[in-house]
Swiss-Prot record:
Organism: Corynebacterium aurimucosum (strain ATCC 700975 / DSM 44827 / CIP 107346 / CN-1) (Corynebacterium nigricans)
Catalytic activity: a 2-demethylmenaquinol + S-adenosyl-L-methionine = a menaquinol + S-adenosyl-L-homocysteine + H(+)
Name of the protein in its database record: Demethylmenaquinone methyltransferase
Catalytic class of the enzyme: transferase
UniProt pathway annotation: Quinol/quinone metabolism; menaquinone biosynthesis; menaquinol from 1,4-dihydroxy-2-naphthoate: step 2/2
Originating gene: menG
Length: 229
């Protein structure tokens, strides 16, 4: 598989994630060295959902991120293209909806805030996905995007690149039910826009005031923006 076939069709991506659903959460904890829970908490704090607000958690997977967002008292719905992932999170008591990030099954101006964590890379046309998220968000509403990015310390960046190339695939073979998905993960991270490039893409696709905070030396970048009022 060359470059993890980064031009996969949406159905292929969904099928790939269907196969990892049952072990997805534990695999992410292992591969992130336990940082995933902290990243979810910081995403919730940045989005700052309020009691009574409606929040869309796109590419929610097993809804572990939706569960974290729900701690705020907001009404949070998990939306994902992979039925297998949603099924794997069936025990989590949050609303779940199957949906394509390029054609969201919600009316205009439905949500007070929208977030997507580690899923924007997997939307075939991620700029269309950003516009769709803006469409379903109320004027003045908020966006938070947590996504793997480029480490800001050069030496650490070299170590991280080696981790993605040499260590992540064999670890995934041990802990994941579908190691191919994590080869795709590594390749898609390396091909992803840098922090400033993603901020520019957010600003030209229905949002404004895009900025970011680097987490764990920039392994993850937490972008935020608002929809024009």
């Amino acid at each position: 598989m060359s470059k993890a076939d980064l031009e996969k069709k949406p159905f292929d991506v969904a099928r790939m994630f269907d196969a990892v659903g049952k072990k997805y959460d534990i695999t992410n904890t292992v591969l992130s060295f336990g940082q995933d829970a902290r990243w979810r908490r910081l995403t919730r704090e940045r989005l700052n959902p309020q009691p009574g607000e409606k929040v869309l958690d796109l590419a929610a997977g097993t809804a572990v991120s939706t569960e974290e967002l729900s701690k705020s008292g907001a009404w949070c719905v998990a939306c994902d293209f992979s039925l297998g992932m949603l099924a794997a999170g069936a025990e989590r008591d949050v609303p779940k909806v199957a949906g394509d990030g390029m054609r969201l099954p919600f009316a205009d101006n439905t949500f007070d805030a929208v977030t997507i964590s580690y899923g924007l890379r997997n939307i075939h046309d991620f700029e269309l996905g950003l516009r769709e998220m803006a469409r379903v968000t109320k004027p003045g509403g908020r966006l938070a995007v947590a996504e793997f990015s480029k480490p800001v310390i050069p030496v650490f960046g070299t170590v991280y690149k080696e981790y993605l190339t040499r260590l992540l695939p064999p670890i995934a073979k041990v802990v994941s039910s579908n190691p191919e998905a994590y080869i795709y993960l590594a390749e898609s991270i390396r091909a992803w826009p840098e922090q400033h490039e993603l901020a520019a893409a957010i600003n030209r696709n229905g949002w404004e005031q895009a900025g970011w905070r680097n987490l764990t030396f920039g392994i993850v970048a937490l972008h935020s923006a608002v929809k024009p009022a």
